[in-house]
Amino acid sequence: MTHQPSFSQAEFADKKKITRREKFLTRMEALIPWAKLLAVIEPFYPKGERGRPPIGLERMLRVYFLQQWYGLADEALEDALYDSQALQGFARIDLTAEGVPDATTLLKFRRLLETHDLCKGLFAAINTDLTARGLLLREGTLVDATLIAAPPSTKNKEKKRDPEMHQTRKGNQWYFGMKAHIGADRDSKLVHTVVVTAANVADVTKTAELLHGQETQVHADAGYTGVEQRAEIVALKRKID
């Protein structure tokens, strides 16, 4: 997909120091199979038959990824896009000709992905492409879990405390929210599987779901002590260290 940089972007590209953010974004640009991801979303994306035409799908997807990578709220992302030429370049936004997507537009795009459960399709398309390119070697899997904290006052659409969220204790600290159980390729460190549960679900109970079945080794930290004795792991005949 061709993209003509603006004069300011070309000038920015000539500077001598390359920041860590720029290196990361350059790597993501090369890794992500953009055409395949756009094909997942395109059937559900507004065509603009009525009213003003929607912002281009690729730009919205790029902005969405930036929001996820840097953990920015809608308004903070809007500000960051105005402030950072590196982010503008990745999102393919030329401020001399256009503005950045506002908070309402960002929210609508996220809801589109959620309503049609498109994130699973995006994740699957990325992993299929990485495997085909030999970037997911699939010989070993690292398993881990991370808490996704939410304010205890978080309510669902019915204005009730979300039943999918629970409290858990880690060390001396209590958390309320969800937990992401992650399986990652040992060599590339790229994530191949994610299972999301309530925060109080024990790490060991989801281990088998994080394995793709082709690995010869599984690596886990002390939080997975005793996992080898679980029936589902014994059945898989996988040694975990």
State where each predicted segment sits.
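Secondary-structure capping and boundary motifs in well-ordered enzyme cores
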Residues: 30-33, 52-58, 98-101
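A detector of single, family-specific signature residues
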Residues: 36, 45, 60, 78-79, ...
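An N-terminal domain-cap segment
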Residues: 38-58
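Polybasic low-complexity intrinsically disordered regions
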Residues: 2-8, 57, 75, 82, ...
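Charged, often Cys/His-bearing segments associated with DNA-binding zinc-finger transcription factors
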Residues: 1-34, 42-43
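N-terminal core-binding DNA-recognition domain of tyrosine recombinases/integrases
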Residues: 48-52, 71-73, 111-114
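Alpha-helical support elements that line or immediately flank enzyme active sites
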Residues: 59-71
